[in-house]
């Protein structure tokens, strides 16, 4: 079975480093819950678009390089691959982040079969690649996936908890995600 997985806030846990860099840059502590109230940083802490751009220009690469993987992510993906899953990373990250991203994935031994960069419409990408499931966090991507009929596992963050659909489930633990996908794979074989 083919599955798709996002990187930021799904494989890569940017929360701790993001919190520290926001404090360093803006001189004020914001909780992770506050930072993730909205998908865009500027909407969560009420800064201008220009301030947000400057923040990401200064710290974006560092956050992408130095953040740790989500707990149990590597083990869960390895287990899924051992059980016949084909793992495709689908990310909105531009190609100019390819070197950093590839290096981070290798450093943390994240198992996957294919990676696709610069994807704006993840639902369409999943349909084109015949991928029935995707693990995602961004609400706009989740909506696009659901519109295309792609079953979606959402890593729960305040910015996506309002979404509800028969093809959507919120799961916060990679071990539970792996278990759920294995159950779905067995269901697909029986159908």
In which residue ranges do the predicted regions lie?
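Conserved Lys-Pro-Asp/Glu-containing loop-to-beta segment of HAD-superfamily phosphomonoesterases
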Residues: 122-145
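Conserved acidic residues
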Residues: 1, 113, 132
């Amino acid at each position: 079975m083919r599955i798709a997985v996002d990187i930021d806030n799904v494989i890569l846990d940017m929360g701790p480093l993001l919190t520290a860099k926001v404090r360093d840059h803006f001189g004020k502590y914001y909780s992770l819950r506050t930072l993730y109230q909205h998908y865009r940083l500027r909407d969560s802490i009420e800064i201008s678009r220009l301030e947000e751009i400057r923040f990401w220009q200064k710290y974006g690469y560092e956050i992408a390089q130095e953040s740790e993987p989500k707990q149990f992510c590597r083990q869960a993906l390895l287990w899924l691959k051992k059980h016949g899953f084909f793992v495709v990373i689908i990310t909105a990250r531009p190609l100019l982040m390819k070197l950093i991203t590839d290096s981070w994935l290798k450093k943390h031994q994240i198992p996957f079969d294919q990676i696709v960069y610069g994807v704006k419409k993840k639902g369409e990408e999943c349909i084109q690649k015949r991928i029935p499931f995707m693990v995602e966090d961004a609400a706009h991507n989740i909506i696009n996936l659901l519109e295309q009929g792609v079953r979606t596992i959402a890593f729960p963050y305040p910015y996506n908890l309002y979404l509800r659909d028969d093809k959507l489930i919120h799961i916060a633990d990679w071990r539970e995600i792996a278990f759920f996908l294995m159950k779905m794979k067995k269901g697909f074989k029986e159908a």
